Amino acid sequence: MGRTRMFGSIHLVLLSLVFWLAGFAYYAFAQSPELVQAAKKEGEVVVFGSLENDVAAAINKGFETKYGIRVNYFRGSSTVIIDRVTTEHRAGKMSSDIIYTTSEPMKFINKEKGLFARYIPSSAKGYDKKLIDDFFGPNYRSVIIGFIFNKSMISPDEAPKSYEDVVNPKWRGKIAMGNPSLHDTTIDWLSSMDSVFGSQTKANDWIKGLAALKPLLLDSMVPVGERVASGEVPLGVAYVKYVQVWGRKGAPVDYVKGLPVYLGDGNYIAMTAKAPNPNAAKLFVDYFLGAESSAIMAGVGEFVNRQGIYPPISGADHVVKSFVQMNSMSVDEYNKKKEEYRQIFSR
């Protein structure tokens, strides 16, 4: 993705920002000169996150320009990040100051191990109260799953209009998705279909209908987006943000609009309990949750939750309003679902 093009879209989003001044009593006050100076003495902040490198780089550059503090960024999946931080915590040699990734793993591991420190900065006032966790603070973005399609292969009129339309036999062999015997997010998505259909029985019937289409099963949703964008398959189960990600590259990608429910995952950012650079970490959390960082993320298609900021995707406001957090499962429940879906999709 070209840096010049990315910042062009970001600039347009920045022009439309609205700042909310109402706050909540328990938030930290605006950052003091003392904190800024202490953070500058530390000189760096180490961040483990799941944002794509180009998006994170734009955010990190903004922070570095504003404060003169270097950001060292490591990108990984939620599983990789949590495993690494857990290992470091256990060894008493924490290298990371900040973690940001999907909400459920962060909640689970914090309850089990106490890996994180509570810090809710003044920039959190720009989020709806219902999206603010008492410990972690705002759910800063939602990674939302829908159905994307290649407009050169399927016209908007021909595209599915509902979950029921997706399992029409005419899409047999023409849809790609994450492999539900391998890909965590796809497993979570399928296991949450009761939130779409209102009952587990109807959800199970729909899942079997999806499997009957003999979808192309891939390692994750990233290659699903690639295959749809390239025209290898016309339809895919993937992140709605790919409409913007691939559209910016000239690919004719659209998504099924107007669904009653869009499932997905929330994301948190938190300081580690033993952060080597705690002052720089606080400063980074405040910046990350602020309007500038949110605009950068929205500009490349992310569904950020700071009020009034949307990605440049048609119908984005409806997607946000229709978002439902995917179900959380215990390890045993997850493994059971994984085996169940392996059997269903291998028939």
Segment roles from a protein language model:
Residues 129, 142-145, 170-181, 206-211, 217-218, 288-310, ...:
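Periplasmic-binding protein-like
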Residues 104-109, 229, 234-254:
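A ligand-binding cleft/hinge motif common to bilobed small-molecule-binding domains
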Residues 29-46, 64-65, 168-170:
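Immediate post-signal peptide segment of exported/extracytoplasmic ligand-binding proteins
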Residues 146-153, 190-194, 265-280, 296-299:
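A bilobed periplasmic-binding-protein/Venus flytrap-type ligand-binding module shared by bacterial periplasmic
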Residues 46-60, 72-89, 94-232:
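Extracytoplasmic ligand-binding site segments that recognize negatively charged/polar headgroups
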Residues 11-26:
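Bacterial N-terminal signal peptides
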Residues 311-347:
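Extracellular/periplasmic bilobal clamshell ligand-binding domains
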